[in-house]
């Protein structure tokens, strides 16, 4: 006899050995062997002393969450951002150079950014403690011969646990008693159909398939039907549920594309800043200037070139995106996640509960005499109709249909109360059908005399009943189950009220109809009735399906059209998976489907080569999903994973963005996810992708504005310094320009409304820097116009070679007006300001008006004139400056027009793009 594999832990006090059995091994052993190995008493349970001893070694039946780091450490960790570190260095240098105004402004900017990021992370990132919510707070346990209520966390290996309908299994159990037990394991395995449980030893499948362990009740699963007793074999992290937990802890979440872009931008800015320092120092040294003086000037210029407002605008832009997503019933747990969806090009979606409702529904009826009926409505309720040849059938109006409904209703243990199912989903679908026909009261009209419960071996259920008002008549037998099994007990079939002999021709006809319904993704049940099991009359077939969610097909179509590939990953059969995928538009003639077993045999390298053409993965487990996602990421794809069950949790965390269902999603799933869809609406993902693309565009708009302004200011001061010109701007004027650069006008660019055309554009490549060649060109063009225009005004005013307050006021105001027009043209990289609407962004309008009012106060308000060393300008001066500075906006509009014309020409000349599956 094989020796059980288990871990032996010595008990110090009584020198006994406490074993730890895996569910795979326990399922192969007889109950007596398991009890012997666990030193357990199945009937009387453990005594309290033994429970204490075992808990000392096994711990509590809960998950070991590592202690969270202190808040101060979390706060300090925010400073590790490259841009923040660069700003800190700038602030320190400013203090050393006694430029306290810059030092204060930079320090305040740092504190704002860090605090906002810290608060957001603190509120949104919960620890994995939410996992414990899946474990019920109480359970029924036998100890010292008594049945008692105890906390689930108190259980230890060897405890005897009692289960009944509605209970959530508190630990992994080896069942030793089971009466018509059916457990919903969809949250763990992805299988929609509840698993029938037995007590006999079951050889475990070689691939470790949990569904093959039919004598094991797994932690976190739900008892749908029957009752049972089991012995605890695994608690906490030693359970199968705990394995998922450990996989989650081991998986590190990848950096988001925005984080990568910001890191790259920080490095680029550092490189450019130090490059400027080196060049200015070298040129100054060659010109014979004092090296220390040149170093001071160079560092000042480098500090001025760093856009310290960038982290603030990025944070604010993302936060506003999160707020907009909340209004659309989506909770984003981390700020950069919304933007990540903007470059997502693959969505891996679980079928059950995500693309479908996880509510079995009858959609088609075939009577034994060939009559077809369509059933409308979805879910466990009375809303819907049964339609035959265009007419609505109700009650006993159509006997052929009514008899099928009657059999399905009477041969049934499920109950629907307040639209909530208590029982098996398949039986719930039949009760809902009866409710639509007004026949659900038939269950109470019959008295059940005998019952033949459903089992996975026989694949049918039957009952013997008598009508309450006709108890003196012979018993009637009703049967439902798989067609291949039910037909064996049938000798006749119903044809327009007459009972006719069941011929081979009729059997072949029913077989064809059954196959046709199955190919459409329907689960087919046959129903029959008669005086005895061997003398049944076939009544007909019903087709049941887990229907797609409302609006999913439309969302899928839009996403595919925008260049996003969608792959369905499910534990269902190939036939069902392909049928659902076809209905949703995910599966075409050129698509491929791959099983979980095939995924097992492939290396990630091989899988990454075929995965672009695969639309459906069936019979997939959590480890398969992980492998699929890794293969997609190996191809450079940005992967989003949607799901609602425990089986999705690891993949949700491994994906670039995990999306959980809020209503049907398990707590472990929600904690692993980056975004939660409150209403389980798949369409919200499309809105999130649109939001993500819009957010990235807004960030690019801000970067364009701020860098062009920074470069212009840097170039202006550098030229004046190198050419021994008087400084065209004084310190306070430069500070005011910096406030405008990083203040309301700049930040209002981050709240620009999302362009409705953005969803039609393909996902961007996450490898691309935020500073693309096109953006750099636009930045340089704007900078050159600003520098040339400002120098022209300075040269025009400085004809006597004596600098006066008027000279600096004209130059200063010219630069500020250039800033305002530059901000206006930066609102969109592709559309004209008139096309997007001058007042479509009210915050921008208020910010620009406020800045102009502030500039006028600086020019005309005497106290501020002294501070900024300015003087009043005439109306002609202002009109001249407005005309000159508007050139930066006019040139930008011309560039946009040229780009749109070129893009339109390219679209007309290029061929049709390849299939969306070629990701």
Curated annotation (Swiss-Prot):
GO terms for cellular component: cis-Golgi network membrane; endoplasmic reticulum; Golgi apparatus; Golgi cisterna membrane; Golgi membrane; plasma membrane; secretory granule; trans-Golgi network. The keyword DNA repair does not apply. Its EC number is 7.2.2.10. Disulfide bonds: none annotated. It holds the Pfam family Cation_ATPase_C. Coiled coil: none annotated. It is an enzyme of class 7 (translocase). Belongs to the cation transport ATPase (P-type) (TC 3.A.3) family. Type IIA subfamily. PANTHER family: CALCIUM-TRANSPORTING ATPASE. This is Calcium-transporting ATPase type 2C member 1.
